[in-house]
Curated annotation (Swiss-Prot):
This is Exocyst complex component 7. SUPFAM superfamilies: Cullin repeat-like. Transmembrane segments: none annotated. It comes from Drosophila melanogaster. GO terms for molecular function: beta-catenin binding; phosphatidylinositol-4,5-bisphosphate binding. InterPro entries: Cullin_repeat-like_dom_sf, Exo70, Exo70_C. Keywords: Exocytosis, Phosphoprotein, Protein transport, Transport.
Length: 693
């Protein structure tokens, strides 16, 4: 049964496979027929395409040739139109060119110039003998001239010198944003854009415009400075009003011009110090403590010893810097960068020249003042020099090398004037001129401190406020630099201390000449005591002034024994003064030479000796007291010390003489000779140096 089932299954599978094989064979036959048919179709299609290509290709080639002809025709027409436009451009733009450009619509005029330039290029290359070339060239040149005139007109129309008050705002309000002062920006943005467009067109077409711009804007700077200068002459100096910065804001208290200047230069000095500090900290990692700098010496005394003309000049110098910074900012918006240096140099030249010439005039005037012994002008020079030095970083940033060299003349003029002032002051102290520092040749009758001494001390005290600039001036003198080298061989000094040492050398020379002058002047007195007291007054005043102002520490850099020398000189003068009493005391000092009284009596021949001794003492003492009551010793301690020394020196000698001989009967009229008791001598000595006694 199982075998039967297996056979049946095998039979069924065989039949099924036979059926599938027949079906596959049938399909293969059909595929072969289809392939044969497709091959026939493709062969026919290929033949037909070949026939079509043979038909279409000539048409295509003909069409391509027609297209080329059309393109050539269009190009020819365009060329003809272009050529015709070149011939017509003269008539087309003639009226526009002669009318000139219109502000705010410059592009139309520039388009017309572009057409003329193209026509000019065409005729120049294709028909150089054509009359049309002359026409377009003439019109183009006329247009360029009109454009240049329009450029100049725009600059003139929108450029006006700053009013003095506006310029003073720019000077005094250094750190404020310029956006607050849009009224200063006379050239609006649209005007700047138009000027920029014209500048670049003229630059590309090799036309001159830099001189026009530099001349017009340079005139603005120059006129602004001249108006400021006139304003300073006409206005009450030191109280110029500033414009209100913001409406509705409470007005600030008025400051004097000098105070504003001080504030500006203090800011500059602080900026320099901060920049130096940051540099050192970044390079070394160490922080530094603020040392004395320019700003430390820009005190109110600077303003007192300053010269108004110099302060006005500093305002001019600051004004020039602000104006030129302003011009640089404007120039960036108008002039191509490649022309900046050239334009700025021309623009700034006249203004810088004005400032330099003003410096020459001021320094000449100050030299005349110094020749008249007006020493505040000399101190003003040093103050101005200090401030000009503070301006150097701004000058380096603002000006090109040639302009910096031009402005160096200001610095050199001030340095030269300062050197002349120092030199002339020494000459005056030496007494080489016909008059002394106060213009008088007489010494004071009361032998008080001579005005030469007080003025010399006043001057050198004020010099200390400017030791930095004075040191730089003196360093250029080989005599001072040599002495400084000698000091440095003994002791190393930092740069700031070197400037102080140079000033100390100068003060040492001034004091030496002053001492010599005082010594010579004391010879004008006939009385020896007055001579010594005159010198003592002056030497004591010098020493106390040096000690009070701490200048003694400065002078010690150049002369370590200065204080000791003056103290020794005072001691010697006091001793010399005490010796002037010797003539009066010589007759009563040596008791051994006098007759010895016995029971209150002396021999008849000795009476005349005692009369003579008492009489001579009385006469000399009264004469000395009379003279010295008219002498003034201003210093209380010195005056009382000398009185005390006189009492200690004279009274004991007189007392001994008085006690022995006052009771001796050597005259019928003893009161005629024994005129003074001990307390009366003491009272008279206490009234010395007091003319009212």
């Amino acid at each position: 049964m199982n075998n039967l089932d297996s056979s049946l299954q095998a039979h069924n599978k065989l039949e099924k496979e036979a059926t599938n094989l027949a079906l596959l064979k049938d399909r293969v036959d059909k595929y072969h027929d289809l392939s044969t048919q497709m091959s026939s179709i493709l062969t026919i299609f290929e033949k037909r395409l070949g026939n079509l290509e043979q038909t279409i290709l000539p048409v295509y080639q003909e069409t391509e040739q027609l297209q080329k002809r059309q393109q050539n025709l269009e190009a020819t027409l365009n060329c003809l139109e272009s050529v015709l436009s070149h011939y017509d451009v003269s008539q087309e733009v003639c009226q526009l060119i002669h009318q000139g450009p219109v502000e705010g619509n410059i592009s139309v005029f520039l388009d017309a110039l572009a057409k003329l330039r193209d026509a000019n290029d065409y005729f120049r290359h294709n028909n150089s003998q054509s009359v049309e070339l002359e026409n377009v060239t003439s019109l183009f040149n006329t247009g360029c001239e009109g454009l240049s005139q329009h450029y100049s007109m725009l600059l003139k129309k929108h450029s006006a010198p700053l009013k003095p008050v506006e310029l003073l705002d720019l000077i005094y309000i250094e750190d404020d944003s310029s956006d607050e002062y849009t009224s200063f920006r006379q050239l609006s943005q649209t005007t700047r854009e138009e000027l920029y467009t014209i500048s670049h067109w003229l630059e590309q077409n090799l036309r001159e415009y830099t001189n026009i711009y530099a001349t017009e804007r340079g005139e603005v700077v120059l006129r602004s400075l001249q108006l400021l200068k006139d304003h300073q002459k006409s206005n009450s100096w030191g109280h110029e009003a500033l414009r209100p910065r913001h409406s509705g804001r409470q007005t600030e208290p008025k400051k004097t011009t000098s105070a504003r200047l001080q504030q500006i230069f203090e800011k500059k000095a602080n900026k320099l110090y901060l920049r130096a500090t940051q540099t050192i900290e970044q390079s070394t990692g160490f922080s530094i403590k603020k040392a004395s700098s320019h700003s430390d010496h820009l005190t109110s005394e600077d303003l007192m010893d300053g010269d108004q003309e110099l302060d006005k000049y500093l305002v001019m110098l600051l004004g020039l810097q602000r104006l030129l910074n302003w011009e640089r900012a404007i120039m960036i918006d108008i002039i191509p960068q490649s022309k900046h240096n050239e334009v700025f140099a021309t623009l700034a030249y006249n203004a810088i020249d004005l400032v330099v010439k003003d410096a020459e005039a001021i320094t000449q005037r100050i030299l005349r003042c110094i020749s008249r012994k007006e020493w505040t002008s000399a101190l003003g020079i040093f103050s101005a020099l200090k401030r000009v030095i503070l301006l150097q970083p701004d000058i380096d940033r603002t000006y090109d090398p040639a302009q910096r060299e031009q402005l160096k003349k200001v610095l050199k003029k001030l340095q030269h004037t300062g050197a002349k002032a120092l030199e002339h002051f020494l000459d005056v102290v030496k007494g080489e001129s016909s008059t002394n520092i106060v213009g008088q040749s007489n010494v004071p009758k009361d032998a008080t401190v001579h005005e030469l001494t007080s003025n010399t001390i006043w001057f050198i005290e004020h010099l200390y406020d400017h030791f930095d600039v004075i040191g730089s001036i003196l360093a250029q003198d080989v005599l001072y630099s040599t002495q400084l080298d000698t000091i440095l061989m003994k002791k190393a000094l930092p740069v700031e201390e070197r400037n102080k040492a140079l000033l100390a050398i100068y003060i040492k020379k001034a004091l030496a000449e002053l001492n010599l002058s005082i010594m010579n002047k004391c010879e004008q007195y006939n009385d020896q005591a007055t001579k010594h007291l005159f010198r003592l007054n002056n030497i004591h005043y010098i020493l106390k002034s040096l000690q009070r102002s701490n200048l003694i520490d400065l002078v010690t850099l150049a002369e370590p024994e200065c204080e000791h020398s003056y103290m020794e000189m005072i001691r010697e003068l006091k001793a010399s003064y005490q010796k002037t009493w010797s003539k009066m005391l010589v007759g009563i000092y040596s008791l051994d030479e006098l007759p010895k009284p016995v029971a209150g009596k002396v021999k008849d021949k000795d009476r005349s000796v005692l009369k003579e001794r008492f009489s001579n003492f009385n006469k000399d003492f009264e004469e000395a007291c009379k003279i010295q009551r008219g002498i003034s010793i201003p210093d209380v301690i010195l005056r009382e010390g000398i009185k005390r020394d006189n009492v200690e020196h004279i009274l004991p000698i007189y007392n001994r003489f008085y006690e022995i001989y006052s009771g001796v009967h050597f005259s019928k009229n003893p009161d005629k000779y024994v005129k003074y008791r001990q307390h009366e001598i003491n009272a008279m000595l206490s009234k010395l140096f007091d003319d009212s006694a």
